[in-house]
Amino acid sequence: ALFDHAACFSLEELRELHLIALNFCIRQINVSNRSYFHEALDLYREGLHKDTLLENGYLSRFTYHNIVAAGLQCGELTWVDHFMDQYKNAMERTYRDSTYSFNRAKLAYARGRLRDALGLLQTANYRDLLLNLPAKALALKIYYELDEPDVLQNHLTAMRTFIHRKRVIGYHRTNYLNLIRLTQRLLTINVFDKK
């Protein structure tokens, strides 16, 4: 519906309208109104079709991540797979490989291919802190689901050290330290004990 009267607007005006609509959807998602994932995915698809998501000819890594996240939440795994390949080279070279690899890992995880996801996470170089921590969190989930408590314990220790060494600021630090603490608690109450 946003693009029904696209001819009345310049590309820049369409881009601004599109971003307003996407930001609304993201705010709704952030307050647990998950039905807006479908709205967001529709907006992303239309934006890709109309080129309103490109900035200076590039698709930002954040937009790429958000598109993948919306697609995965909507269960559109095949579409996400095609999107990732089609738009990989639309990202700036600096973040291209790590962003692509991380999102490939998320797709593998969504498909239940945990070992494949882990392999993708372990081979990529995540110099970007905003990507490194989510990659570590995904690895944490995989170790837990693979029932590997020793590996998980080592991962938690390394992750805590990383967070303290990098001096992660604000709520990121708190959120990831809470994730570590709660996972550690799960380990100590023997959740891996199937008896």
Q: Locations of the language-model features?
A:
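Active-site-proximal binding-pocket segments
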Residues: S98, G112-L138, Y143-H155, F162-I163
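Long, ordered, amphipathic alpha-helical scaffolds
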Residues: T157-K195
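Loop-centered beta-sheet repeat module
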Residues: F37-G47, D51-L72
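Specific register positions within alpha-helical solenoid repeats of the TPR/Sel1-like families, i.e.
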Residues: I26-N30, L72, Y109, Y144, ...
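Helix-turn-helix repeat elements of alpha-solenoid scaffolds
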Residues: A1-F3, S32-R45, G71-F83, Y109-L118
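Solenoid-like repeat scaffolds
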Residues: F3-L14, R45-G57, D85-Y95, Q122-L131, ...
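"A position-specific structural signal for the A-helix of alpha-solenoid helical repeats
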Residues: I20-F24, F62-N66, T99-K106, A110, ...
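Amphipathic alpha-helical repeat scaffolds of TPR domains
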Residues: L11-V31, G57-A69, T99
